[in-house]
Amino acid sequence: MSKRESSKYKIDRRMGENIWGRPKSPVNRREYGPGQHGQRRKGKLSDFGVQLRAKQKLKGYYGDLREKQFRAIFAEADRRKGDTSENLIGLLESRLDAIVYRAKFVPTVFAARQFVNHGHVSVNGVRVNIGSYRCKAGDVIEVREKSKQLVIVLEAVSLAERDVPDYIEVDHNKMVATFGRVPTLSDVPFPVVMEPHLVVEFYSR
């Protein structure tokens, strides 16, 4: 298991949930957190603890985003009109690395960020190597020609453990995806319950 894979599963163990729905997640085999004290019984969380956990889970799901980066995304969601929690999900799902992951071009969101950073993806015909790049409805995301036969791509496309959501149209033969619309919380196929309203409460304290 690579260092990055180990780090990813550490998030699962910390949360006590298989947040990406992966068959190899260690929480499928045990119900305690990482480290030598992981088997200690956990007490009931305070309201703050519940809010913090919701934030850490959402932040971890999108590739264990840095706090400064995640807080900036929240700040923009809060500035926009409408429901802040829905805005937050919409902004996170509009990230290029999230769309590459949702389109099943790669197996994990961590791999998606690295894949984008290494220049394997174009948006509307222009190479983009920034995972946090924000896509708009109608944008066309394509795996670059030289990258379409990479093993990581071919294996990801064949994975049956997750489906492409209906707000993204994908042609896996051409390795092209169209970001149809910005989704709402109910549209997003999270394997576990995400509670962005608790994230709003956390940052609104």
UniProtKB/Swiss-Prot annotation:
Record has Ribosomal protein as a keyword: yes
Keyword Lipid metabolism carried by entry: no
Name of the protein this chain belongs to: Small ribosomal subunit protein uS4
InterPro entries the UniProt entry points to: Ribosomal_uS4, Ribosomal_uS4_bac-type, Ribosomal_uS4_CS, Ribosomal_uS4_N, S4_RNA-bd, S4_RNA-bd_sf
Gene Ontology molecular function: rRNA binding; structural constituent of ribosome
Top-level division of the source organism's lineage: Bacteria
Matching PROSITE patterns: RIBOSOMAL_S4, S4
Subunit: Part of the 30S ribosomal subunit. Contacts protein S5. The interaction surface between S4 and S5 is involved in control of translational fidelity.
CDD domains: S4
Residues covered by region (Disordered): 1-46
NCBIfam families, A to Z: PRK05327.1, rpsD_bact
Organism from which the protein derives: Rhizobium johnstonii (strain DSM 114642 / LMG 32736 / 3841)
Taxonomic lineage: Bacteria, Pseudomonadati, Pseudomonadota, Alphaproteobacteria, Hyphomicrobiales
